UniProtKB/Swiss-Prot annotation:
GO cellular component: cytosol
Reaction(s) catalysed (UniProt annotation): adenosine(1518)/adenosine(1519) in 16S rRNA + 4 S-adenosyl-L-methionine = N(6)-dimethyladenosine(1518)/N(6)-dimethyladenosine(1519) in 16S rRNA + 4 S-adenosyl-L-homocysteine + 4 H(+)
Lineage: Bacteria, Pseudomonadati, Pseudomonadota, Alphaproteobacteria, Hyphomicrobiales
InterPro entries in the record: KsgA/Erm, rRNA_Ade_diMease-like_C, rRNA_Ade_Mease_Trfase_CS, rRNA_Ade_methylase_Trfase_N, rRNA_adenine_dimethylase, SAM-dependent_MTases_sf
Protein name in UniProt: Ribosomal RNA small subunit methyltransferase A
Annotated residues for binding of S-adenosyl-L-methionine: 28, 30, 55, 77, 103, 123
Length: 291
């Protein structure tokens, strides 16, 4: 009998610890162990891996990660009610589960890795998922401390992460992701898989960081994409005026049609614009402010 067989069913755990999902924390619990195993396997072979999990809740995905061979799981949980349930899993897998009670937006996990390369696997709380992803993709220095991100999002958000030009979902999030990583949707998850069921379909995505992304200052890319997509219906010669430099000069330098709109420009085009903007403001290309 394996350690996971010694643990009570998740529904019993939820009942025993009074773990009704809290909307304020963006909680939707996954109880189907076949599904949690599928999510865990989506990150690749787990034997010997160090995994960071955000928002484990009662520990359905945590169990799967450990049962599939993760050497160590570092679980960051904000909800104090869930800690006792996670401690039960830790007891079943001695020395392999470290529980950090805290807000993942504020916790620096790197000191807990002991120099090991880690991957992130998580059913992210819906209310902070995008903010967490942006933080991870903005990591400095780069390459980052993680080798991959396997994450659950609302389907609409997942589409915004992986979108390409000429689509309604394409925007700032897709440009940031495409600059620093390669992302794809692995599969969808129906609302009925969760307790309580959300109103929308969810998707699991897999993100692999690029070892050497095009040099660019993050702050310049953020300003350019904010200006361009903030007025996405306007031509770039108009929308980029808010940058405080001559937009026609930027577009001419980068060879981009001045009548183009934001959704028509690929990631490489935005990186070229950001670097041209950096030079125009006197910051250079890929300077220390987030390069």
């Amino acid at each position: 009998m394996s350690a996971i067989d010694d643990l009570p069913p998740l529904r019993e755990v939820i009942r025993a610890h009074g773990l009704s999902a809290q909307k304020s924390l963006g909680q939707n619990f996954l109880l189907d162990l076949n599904l949690t195993a599928r999510i865990a396997r989506g990150s690749g072979p787990l034997e010997g891996a160090t995994v960071v999990e955000v928002g484990p809740g009662p520990g359905g995905l945590t169990r799967a990660l450990l049962a599939l061979g993760a050497r160590k799981v570092i679980a960051i949980e904000r909800d104090h009610r869930c800690i006792a349930a996670l401690n039960e899993i830790a007891a079943a897998y001695p020395g392999r589960l470290e529980i950090i009670e805290g807000d993942a937006l504020k916790v620096d996990v790197r000191p807990h890795l002991d120099g090991a390369e880690a991957r992130v696997v998580a059913n992210l709380p819906y209310n902070v998922g995008t903010q967490l992803l942006v933080g991870w993709l903005s990591t400095d220095p780069w390459p980052p401390w993680f080798s991959s991100l396997t994450l659950m999002f609302q389907r609409e958000v997942a589409e915004r992460i992986v979108a390409g030009p000429d689509s309604k979902a394409y925007g700032r999030l897709a440009v940031l992701t495409g600059w620093r990583a390669q992302a794809r949707i692995l599969f969808d998850v129906a609302p009925s898989a969760f307790v309580p069921p959300p109103k929308v379909t969810s998707s699991v995505i897999h993100v692999v960081p690029r070892a050497e992304p095009v040099p660019c200052a993050l702050r310049d890319l953020e300003r350019v994409t904010e200006a361009a997509f903030g007025q996405r219906r306007k031509m770039l010669r108009q929308s980029l005026k808010s940058l405080g430099v001559d937009p026609l000069a930027l577009l001419s330098e980068t060879g981009i049609d001045e009548t183009a709109r934001a959704e028509e420009i690929d990631v490489a085009g935005f990186l070229a614009l950001a670097n041209a903007f950096g030079r125009a403001r006197g910051g250079g290309t890929g300077d220390a402010a987030g390069a």
